[in-house]
Swiss-Prot record:
GO terms for cellular component: nucleoplasm. The keyword Phosphoprotein applies. This is Zinc finger protein 574. Belongs to the krueppel C2H2-type zinc-finger protein family. Residues 274-287 have a biased composition (Basic and acidic residues). The modification Asymmetric dimethylarginine is found at R832.
């Protein structure tokens, strides 16, 4: 089983995670039954509306006469309306009714109610138990309850029973602290919507209602509304990535604006000073003395079970005796305080998990986007964002795994889940949270880089696509554009290599970079078995086998395998050299070339020998130096170009033109059966067939090998010099498909033809920024600029002499090997370089030209003598008459 299939199985088996302890479960029944273990089983004081099907008992132990709702049989509770259900399937069906009710177009038509209330039927209402008023939202209901709480004195509690379901216990996975909070949701025409008479309500003894508190298990902060509690919990646990980018980006900008910055966590304070409590509608943060006074004034109706939930040292509320015991242990053993941010934690395990956030220890990596997480639960929750069909998707773009949280979120948009209007983000405003990288002291561009894409000046994006405003790249989904902007343009480099200190944008990049230190290469090429340290490098390498170069320059037609290489190449056409040397003023268009240039100013190269004071610019040169000089062994040399390498593996990795010509030909033409060495050559060969036409077939046999340019003697056959020029039998012409219109020379690729045409047009698109000299090819400019920079990157492994051009190094190596591959066909003398042979051949050419001039002079002298001899005798009259018309026709004047 592959790694990808294993992750898929893991994702299927662990679809549900407990929001309290992050434990994973494979089914909904397991996680719901597990979450009941977090619900406290004490006898809470509940004054509420009971369902007729639920048993109601009196708590006689406390003597208060309050009603306690038993929930042993109904273990599954809906957090939307508080109704208790018997099985997970019933809970899901019940929650689906909420979805249909909140979406008008999907609602099931209901029977007409007997009496239509004045409010809208599509709104869920909240009823006040005192005055029977209905409200459309929890916020309005809560504000109304505040007026009753401030105006009503405290009296003996009395039960209030109505005919509709209520929340009798705490929600699953949340903290419910207060005990006398009751409310009812009434729907138009729904059952159990009967309101008692006014006489019955006047006889009721109204009690002081304590508000429900939702306590965060991470920071102990209390909330009144479940929606606020869920929104706060999202600050501790990352939510899934939304499918639509724009709403999420707007929320991020609004949440991070300086005018309104939300506080996700309270200020870190010692455990003895925690004062997060809300009673009787008063503000959170009263002192301990005031809380104890209010608790004493409320009477002893709380019972012993309620008093056990208060810490005697700091008067903090807790949900269960287990949490209280853990808190008391923090008083005995001391609080667990973070040494970096001074935040206090109740247990050492929570502190260890928090310290992992500071150290960026994320052991669970997402294989899709490279983001890292500290726990497997967070990774699995994040992986759901990559699924094509999220479980619950909101029209605003957010996705949810939990249906209850999805229902709470939809209520924030209003009726039917319609998104609220949001203010669009200005295009030029940067993404919040990702600051611009600070410029370095030296080597940074002094001017902004010009756009290198051909689509920069194009019009608006095509319908259904999203264009990046920085690089004009288009994407099919808004989520892809978001990830591109965050991880390419704005993401800061916050992941550091522990060995060399290099910074990276993603954790996965650090992981791939560490393989350069360890030497691990776990990704081999299936074609040549060459290993690589990352899948991206393997994908780039495989382009060399296929011959594909998808990135082509629009100015010179040169193609590249990487988009970054094309962008750097186009800087040459744009005359943009942003990287300037501070010492000599020479500019470069690539930062690594500036870095290599600086070594020549300092005189110290990065790779130093440990046994001698010599240093080298390349690691390969250092390894060859240690092998030859210190170890006394011979390096591995390339038989084609003579380059030396320290190992056979490095020699196999080396690629040169001569070795490529000798490579086995594995690509066969389907028309003529010819085999070539690469897919690019096969494509050019097939183009030659297409250019030849359907009636012509290229010769299957290759033509006779042409003699090298150095061994071909210039042929001179002057006509009329006393000899006849014999033409050699013409070989069958082999067309290649691309022909020069000026000189009819054939080429196999479009790039070669465009470079050749510059010879006829005189175009030189690569000028030198230092001296102004222009060149036809970028490689010629690159070699020329080394004359200005003094850079000599090609050093001999034997004597250490450095050269600016690799060809000069190859010629220099022949001094040590004694090789002389270039021989003169006239005299047989051999040379180490082609330039020396060319100079020698000029002497033979001069001798040949002198001989030709001598032959011409002798021929002219012989012709002159013949004219002088024949001009003495006069022509007969008849012949003169015949010659005269011919002479006039040719424009020759005959004297005499």
């Amino acid at each position: 089983m592959t790694e990808e299939s294993e992750e898929t199985v893991l994702y299927i088996e662990h679809r549900y995670v407990c929001s309290e302890c992050n434990q994973l479960y494979g089914s909904l029944e397991e996680v719901l039954m597990h979450q009941n273990s977090h619900v406290p089983q004490q006898h809470f004081e509940l004054v509420g509306v009971a369902d007729p099907g639920v048993t109601v008992a009196t708590d006689t132990a406390s003597g208060t006469g309050l009603y306690q709702t038993l929930v042993q049989e109904s273990q599954y509770q809906c957090l939307e309306c508080g109704q208790l259900l018997m099985s997970p399937s019933q809970l899901l069906e019940h929650q689906e009714l909420h979805l249909k009710m909140m979406t008008p177009q999907e609602a099931v038509p209901a029977e007409p109610p007997p009496k239509a209330p004045p409010l809208s039927s599509s709104t869920i209402h909240y009823e006040c138990v005192d005055c029977k008023a209905l409200f459309a939202s929890q916020e309005l209901w809560l504000n109304h309850r505040q007026t009753h709480l401030r105006a009503t004195p405290t009296k003996a509690p009395a039960p209030v029973v109505l005919g509709s379901p209520v929340v009798p216990g705490p929600p699953v996975g949340q903290a419910r602290v207060a005990v006398e909070h009751s409310y009812r949701k009434a729907e138009e025409g729904g059952e159990g919507a009967t309101v008692p008479s006014a006489a019955a309500t006047t006889t009721e003894v109204v009690t002081e209602v304590e508000l429900l508190l939702y306590k965060c298990s991470e920071c102990s902060q209390l909330f009144q509304l479940p929606a606020d509690f869920l929104e706060h919990q999202a600050t501790h646990f990352p939510a899934p990535v939304p499918e639509s980018q724009e709403p999420a980006l707007q929320q991020e900008v609004q949440a991070s604006s300086p005018a309104e910055v939300p506080v996700s966590q309270p200020d870190p304070v010692p455990a003895s000073d925690h004062s997060y409590e809300l009673r009787n509608g008063e503000a959170i943060g009263r002192d301990r003395r005031g809380r104890r006074a209010r608790r004493n004034n409320s009477g002893e109706a709380g019972g012993a079970a309620t008093q056990e939930l208060f810490c005697s040292a700091c008067d903090q509320l807790f949900l269960s005796p287990h949490q209280l015991q853990q808190h008391l242990r923090s008083h005995r053993e001391g609080v667990f305080k973070c040494p970096l941010c001074s935040r206090v934690f109740p247990s050492p395990s929570s502190l260890d998990q928090h310290l992992g956030d500071h150290s960026s220890e994320s052991h669970f990596l997402c294989v899709d986007c490279g983001l890292a997480f500290g726990t497997e639960a967070l990774l699995l929750a994040h992986r759901r964002a990559h699924t094509p069909n999220p479980l619950h998707s909101c029209p605003c773009g957010k996705t949810f795994v939990n249906l209850t949280k999805f229902l709470y979120h939809r209520r924030t948009h209003g009726v039917g889940g319609v998104p609220l209007p949001t203010t669009p983000v200005p295009p030029e405003e940067p993404v919040i949270g990702f600051p611009e990288p600070a410029p370095a002291e030296t080597g940074e561009p002094e001017a902004p880089e010009p756009p290198v894409s051909e689509e920069t000046s194009a019009g608006p994006a095509a319908p259904g696509t999203y264009r990046c405003l920085l690089c004009s790249r288009e994407f099919g989904k808004a989520l892809q554009l978001t990830r591109h902007q965050r991880f390419v343009h704005r993401l800061e480099r916050r992941h550091k290599c522990s060995i060399c200190g290099k910074m990276f944008k993603k954790k996965s990049h650090v992981r791939n970079h560490l393989r350069t230190h360890t030497g691990e290469r776990p990704f081999p090429c299936p074609d040549c078995s060459k290993p690589f340290n990352s899948p991206a490098n393997l994908a780039r390498h495989r382009l060399t086998h296929t011959g594909e170069r998808p990135y082509r320059c629009g100015d010179c037609g040169k193609a590249f395998t990487q988009s970054s290489t094309l962008r750097q190449h186009r800087l040459v056409h744009a005359q943009h050299f942003p990287y300037r040397c501070q010492e000599c003023g020479v500019r470069f268009h690539r930062p690594y070339r500036l870095l290599m240039h600086r070594y020549h100013h300092t005189g110290e190269y990065p790779y130093k020998c440990r046994e001698c004071p010599r240093s080298f610019l390349l690691r390969r040169l250092l390894e060859v130096h240690q092998l030859v000089v210190h170890a006394g062994r011979q390096p591995h040399r390339c038989p084609s170009c003579g380059a030396a390498f320290p190992s056979s593996l490095r020699l196999r990795e080396h690629r040169c033109a001569a070795a490529a010509a000798q490579a086995p030909r594995r690509f066969e033409c389907g028309t003529c059966g010819k085999k070539v060495g690469s897919a690019a050559r096969l494509q050019a060969h097939e183009a030659a067939h297409a250019a030849a036409g359907p009636g012509e077939v290229l010769a299957k046999e290759p033509p006779a090998p042409r003699a090298p340019r150095a061994t071909r003697a210039p042929v001179a056959s002057p006509a009329g010099l006393g000899g006849t020029a014999t033409a050699s039998p013409a070989a069958p012409a082999r067309r290649r498909g691309l022909e020069c219109s000026e000189c009819k020379k054939l080429f196999s690729t479009e790039t070669s033809l465009q470079v050749h045409r510059r010879i006829h047009t005189g175009e030189r698109p690569y000028p030198c920024p230092d001296c102004g000299k222009a060149f036809r090819q970028s490689t010629h400019l690159k070699d020329h600029r080394r004359l200005h920079t003094g850079e000599r990157p090609f050093a001999c492994e034997v004597c250490g002499k450095a050269f600016a051009i690799s060809m000069r190094l190859a010629e220099h190596r022949r001094i040590h090997t004694g090789e002389r591959p270039y021989s003169c066909p006239d005299c047989g003398k051999s040379y180490r370089s082609f330039s020396n042979l060319w100079k020698h051949r000029k002497t033979h050419q001069q001798q040949h030209q002198a001989a030709v001039r001598q032959q011409l002079a002798e021929a002219e002298a012989a012709v002159g003598l013949a004219v002088m001899e024949t001009a003495v005798e006069a022509l007969p009259l008849v012949e003169a008459i015949e010659i005269y018309p011919l002479a006039e026709a040719e424009g020759v004047q005959i004297s005499g």
